[in-house]
């Protein structure tokens, strides 16, 4: 009889705990927004994302390596991204980020980051 009563108490506590946390928001980690690199192009070449978004560039070329070179104020260039590799960055400030490929400046991309 004691075990049965204890089991009911544990069940009641579990139900109450579930109801307590049921109304709380759950933060879901968003998947990165992916930009492919193939045929010496960024695909898509222009994207719009919210502050806090991670953008991931994936090199789908067979032989060529590329980089992501941000050309605006405080410009920055990623390490080389070899075929089959990727590089990512979190955009934590709103603005327009224009980039090219360091070794292939004809490759152009743009990211619009909004609140």
Regions found by a protein language model. Name each.
Residues 7, 18, 23-115:
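Extracytoplasmic copper-binding redox domains, predominantly the cupredoxin/blue-copper superfamily
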Residues 8-14:
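Sec-dependent signal peptide recognition
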Residues 1-6:
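Short, Lys/Arg-enriched N-terminal segments with co-localized hydrophobic residues
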């Amino acid at each position: 009889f004691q075990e049965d009563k204890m089991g009911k108490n544990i069940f009641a506590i579990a139900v109450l705990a579930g109801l307590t946390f049921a109304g709380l928001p759950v933060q879901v980690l968003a998947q990165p927004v992916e930009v492919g690199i193939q045929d010496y192009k960024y695909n898509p070449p222009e994207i719009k994302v919210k502050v806090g978004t991670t953008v991931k560039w994936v090199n789908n070329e067979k032989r060529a390596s590329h980089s992501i070179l941000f050309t605006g104020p405080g410009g920055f260039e990623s390490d080389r991204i070899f075929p089959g590799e990727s590089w990512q960055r979190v955009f934590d400030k709103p603005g327009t980020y224009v980039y090219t490929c360091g070794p292939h400046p004809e490759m152009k991309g743009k990211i619009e980051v909004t609140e």
